[in-house]
Amino acid sequence: MGIIVISTVYLLGYKIGTYFVLGYMLFGYMLNSYMGASSNSISKKLKRFEREGILFGRGALYLGIGTIAVLGFIDYLPLALSMLIALFISDAVATIVGIGRKTKLPYNKNKSILGFIGYFGSFAIAAYLFIGIYSIPLGAALALIESISIIFDDNITIAIAGIILYKIISFI
């Protein structure tokens, strides 16, 4: 899904691409609502990927909120695309690489060092195509923010951090 969203914004341009992404999000929300309320075999299989006691599709909802925030507040296309990489690709890489690893971060025992490195590396390499050398410090900052455990979902905190950094830089 992340590649589709990033490609849509890149190929169609910021404004039209954003409209299409909002359409994707609306369709995804409707599908998620149906699957959450349904008891068919597909929804049962999908519910296995959610944690016990968590609303079905909550992670996707937070991802949608973060995506809409990025596209709503960052109007510089290269940075917006980089932030979409952070939300859709780097966060997934951190989870895949870091899950079940024994070496944990000293400040957050729920996150692993390999997950942190996976997030940073995937962002720095992929975002380099859009923002060049700035992908390295931004990747380090976003990996740190993603690895800190706070009360909000990391899809929202990453989006907010990117928006704040963009607003600060645009004033300089």
Give the ranges of each region predicted by the language model.
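Interhelical loop and helix-boundary elements at the membrane-water interface
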Residues: 1-20, 30-129, 133-172
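Charge-lined substrate channels and their catalytic hotspots, especially those that engage the 3′ end
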Residues: 27
